[in-house]
Regions:
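Hydrophobic membrane-insertion alpha-helices, especially the h-region
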Residues: 1-11
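Functionally critical loop-and-helix segments that line ligand-binding/catalytic clefts
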Residues: 23-36, 171-228
Length: 228
């Protein structure tokens, strides 16, 4: 029984979380270069309504497939946004400039940008200076707001939400994209997006790998307000 359960979890046929579509009808995957070539017109017709595409990381790295995915997604009916992976110990304004250079000055018709805040590498064992990380995140958000007139959604895990986002009043009014693969976000958390699993597969992309899947918390009218 334990082995069968493990197989179901690994193959994505059973998840710890399974938010019902009637409760969260707006949903979609996180898109990165590891998916390989994506046939966007077909990919977007698989009962998804949105997607966030990784654009940049730090001050120098651009996702290798970002431009193809950004352009390819224009010809679909789903709402798409771009996100940046924050380097916690690197100047936030410089990171925002890198993101802006990649995605362009005008995001009309796109979802508001997002910024991923996650502990990576040695930081999983030896936590970073959380105050420095919060300063860099705040500087990133401020520069994005100055450029596009909107604050980015903050994509965080339990650890980064607790230690960086929720503990700093500068982020009190920012929209939260919360990743929790084993349980639903706490009832007292005001979240906008929730990544609930990393074991979803679709068709029409080259790698066939498992993807992170996200739902939106709100009505269709609420969702439309996130489009620039």
């Amino acid at each position: 029984l334990v082995i069968n359960l493990s197989v179901l979890l690994y193959t994505g046929r059973l998840w710890f979380n399974e938010p019902k579509k009637r409760d969260y009808p707006i949903r979609g995957p996180v898109v990165t270069e590891s998916m390989g070539e994506i046939r966007w017109k077909s990919f977007a017709k698989q009962n998804i309504q949105t997607a966030y595409i990784r654009a940049t990381k730090g001050t120098t790295i651009e996702d290798g497939a970002f431009r193809d995915n950004w352009n390819g997604s224009k010809d679909t009916d789903i709402s798409v946004g771009a996100y940046h992976v924050l380097e916690l110990d690197t100047d936030g304004t410089e990171q925002a400039e890198h993101f802006i250079n990649a995605v362009g000055d005008d995001l009309s018709g796109r979802l508001i940008p997002a910024v991923e805040v996650r502990l990576r590498g040695l930081y999983r064992l030896l936590p970073p200076d959380y105050y420095e990380a919060a300063d860099n995140l705040a500087d990133f958000c401020d520069r994005i707001e100055k450029q596009y007139g909107v604050r980015p959604v903050i994509y965080c895990t339990e650890r980064t939400y607790k230690n960086i986002v929720a503990s700093d009043s500068r982020f009190n009014k920012d929209k939260i994209w919360y990743e929790s693969l084993f349980s639903k976000p706490d009832e007292d958390m005001d979240w906008t997006f929730w990544t609930y699993t990393n074991r979803v597969k679709f068709s029409f992309y080259e790698s066939g790998e498992y993807l992170h899947m996200t739902v939106f918390n709100g009505s269709e009218d609420d969702f439309k307000k996130l489009i620039i």
